[in-house]
From Swiss-Prot:
Homodimer. Keywords: ATP-binding, Ligase, Magnesium, Metal-binding, NAD, Nucleotide-binding. It catalyses: deamido-NAD(+) + NH4(+) + ATP = AMP + diphosphate + NAD(+) + H(+). This is NH(3)-dependent NAD(+) synthetase. Pfam families: NAD_synthase (PF02540). GO terms for cellular component: cytoplasm. CDD domains: NAD_synthase. The lineage of its organism: Archaea, Methanobacteriati, Methanobacteriota, Stenosarchaea group, Methanomicrobia. The gene is nadE. GO terms for biological process: NAD biosynthetic process. Deamido-NAD(+) binds at residues 114, 147, 154, 244-245. Its EC number is 6.3.1.5.
Amino acid sequence: MDIIQAKDIIIDFIGTKLEGTGIEGAVVGISGGIDSALVAYLSVEALGAENVLGIHMPEASTPKSEIEDASKVAEALGIDFKVINITNVLEVYRTAMPDIDGASAHVDGNLKARIRMSMLYYYANMFGRVVMGTGNKSEILLGYFTKYGDGGVDIEPIGDLYKTEVREMSKMLGVPESILEKAPSAGLWEGQTDEDDLGVTYETIDKVLQPILAGEGQERVHLKLGVPMEEISSILLRVRSNLHKRTTPQIAYLDDLRGDWLS
């Protein structure tokens, strides 16, 4: 799909989702990365700068450059912007749960994501706004997000854009160059990057997922793209094993009902 057409669809989606709800504004967690920057830009175009609140939530290991880039986005868009350091909140958790000192980087990182989600909803509830998701299609398919953390949102405006498409649209909308050029990172621990964590680049991930979702087999994708079968299998294993992250919690129905009770 043409990237301009995709942008128009997303902007219409944002407006339609809020229409008739009595809610006019949005809260966006602006990390300093490309996904949240794009969501902020799209939200402003859909709702107006006066109706978008950006919140940056660093902690002790957050690079200064992330705070600077998040601030650039807010300044460029003219939106209200808050910086809330979550280091003290993390320390309260660590004091209350002594076992947390032995937690892996992933476990600790997931806690940070869930604290941030709670803060976004606090402000959304306070001002009667929605929490905008910043997940892209590549991450959502791979399950590369924290359940009830950065995955805990009201709507996902860029959830049907692959990471490579996010970059293309961000460049078109004028997202700052420092954000476009940096290595993608969830910022869950010091020095973390998405592609080191995943073991494969987003370019490869997207090249594999697009034909697979269009119905092509793994062998054909391997021969056509030259991507090793091990990488293709690894990507698809992530997609399958993280299905639970893309669905709502399952209910143990006591009869044959399999949808909503009122549907």
